[in-house]
Amino acid sequence: MALASCNSPKSAGENPFFTQWDTPFGVPPFDKIRAEHFMPAFERGMSLHDAEIDAITSNNDEPTFENTILAYDNAGQMLAQTELIFGMLCAAETNERMQALQEQVMPLLSAHRDKIRLDEKLFARVKDVYDRRASLGLDAEQSRLLRKTYDAFVRSGALLDAGQKARLKEINGELSLTAVKFGNNILAENNNFALELTADDLEGLPSGVRDAAREKAQAMGKGDKWVFTLHKPSLIPLLTYSTKRDLREKIYKAYLNRCNNGDEYDNKQLINDFIRLRTEKAHLLGYPSYAAYVVADEMAGTTDAVYGLLDQIWEPALERAKGELSEMNTLLQKDIPGATFESWDWWYYAEKLRKQNYALDEEMLRPYFSLENVQGGIFYLANRLYGITFQPVVVPLYHPDAVAYQVLDADGSHLGVLYFDYFPRDGKSQGAWCGNYVEQTYKDGKRVAPVVSVVCNFTRPVGNTPALLTLDETETLFHEFGHALHFLFHDVKYRGLTEVEGDFVEERFGLVERQQRRGVAHRTGEVADDAHHGSDALAVPVGLFDIVAAPRPLTLAVTREEVEIEHAQMRLVGVEHLVGDRLRMIERRHDGLEGDLSLIHI
């Protein structure tokens, strides 16, 4: 990898952030970027940004949209570009050097942002334009940019007094470092755990799962073992298929107790710090809780609206969960009479219930969804719906696992570049996400195309067997691809208008995710072509399509779990009062659910 391949510092003149990129389609020159380039780039970026802000505040002309709002929107582009690349790489391909840089850089960036957003002269000019907005003859885009700019200053503390601003700066600096430490601790715990199994421990595991565990063991120099980790493609199959209840318990508890072991990676105090600092920040800014502060800038608007939706879903989801729990407990009693249903039993007996009640076998379906064919189905769907096409391109890559495509609009014009990075590794965070390495903007009246990346953690190919996706993984890929489409279709004049409310964004791309299920379910639908067997290129048989088309088992039970998680998150950020320096958390229990079922899913 480029960031780790060079140990000797480069001179400032060779820093790729200081030159115009001559790469295809303007993608970042990953083959030239080194870890040591980032700090000089951040320092220069902040210095240039300061100069651009000084030019605005020292302007003696009357504040206008052009000399204040637009000038502010255009400021800080080098810094923003450096932040994008650094942030994306810290999530997808980090190492100890990058993590150390994070801890050094994030407080500096926090202080820099606060200095600008709390600049009284700058805000006075922004407010002057905002107060006269009705008489300025602004078009719709200009009006929205003006409002978003003003609101961003207010939400950042521009209306606070000097003492409050000073405290807010301290809080933001602490929060920035706390967030970095928290994420790095999680990554370390994910990477530190390895469950070594022998041949006697493999009962119930499909051959593909065994092969992947064997390959991991060989990579670790433990060729006589089978190794399972806390990465989802390893963790979930063991929980789902292993007949060894003690092994399921061991890996489940290891995952659940990450950063909760009283060691150097323990996050309990960091969580307490998060809640304490966020609550104090919300109070400074005039909100009863951090949840109220966050939601005020989303479509929901208020915490009451959020709770109203969650409570509306909760009761029917809870009733369905109770019924399915009862069925799974019956299966458990047949295997182990008198046993108490535990969290680590959920995946195993949910799979048994799927087979028993719905004839749905994930392992039976999986061979028909090779990663290559699912990706082809995504491209096919996008072409049918939007007329866009995808062409493989040779561009600099930040890791050998990544692949890149040029995306062409229906008229053949360049829309952007799309990277895919599918497989887990030690330097990558868990989960799936989509982000930009280069944001869409306009320069000299011409559209600057975005460079977008979809990052996942799917099972790697093993030997001659391609990467085969579960239905959940297929839906994840469609969901993240929906975000990618959003970025690729961006065509806005102003940088400040590229962001969309988070709750709106997630719902939109839930629609793309659901389009996948409908398409797979209807063999004459748009994405039926993504369902070809990885080995013989045969379409999924009619009978299997009918199974997938049927109402999905356990959907509402999963919804119950998801709603409970949302409730828990709202409670964590909805704290209004703290007792001393310690937060006393009270776990809500629901009638009719016994045992630790608030954590039945991962």
Predicted regions and their residues:
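C-terminal motif of bacterial Sec signal peptides marking the signal peptidase cleavage site
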Residues: 3-5
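N-terminal helix-rich structural modules
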Residues: 11-206
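Short His/Asp/Glu-rich catalytic/ion-coordination signatures at enzyme active sites or charged loops
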Residues: 22-37, 86-105, 128-170, 229-269, ...
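Active-site-proximal, well-structured secondary-structure segments within enzyme catalytic domains
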Residues: 145, 177, 184, 188-229, ...
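Acidic/histidine-rich catalytic neighborhood
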Residues: 414, 490-517, 521, 528
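Active-site recognition of the HExxH zinc-binding catalytic motif
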Residues: 472-487
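Alpha-helix boundary/capping motif
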Residues: 516-517, 523, 527-537, 547, ...
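Conserved small/polar residues in nucleotide/adenosyl-binding loops
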Residues: 600-602
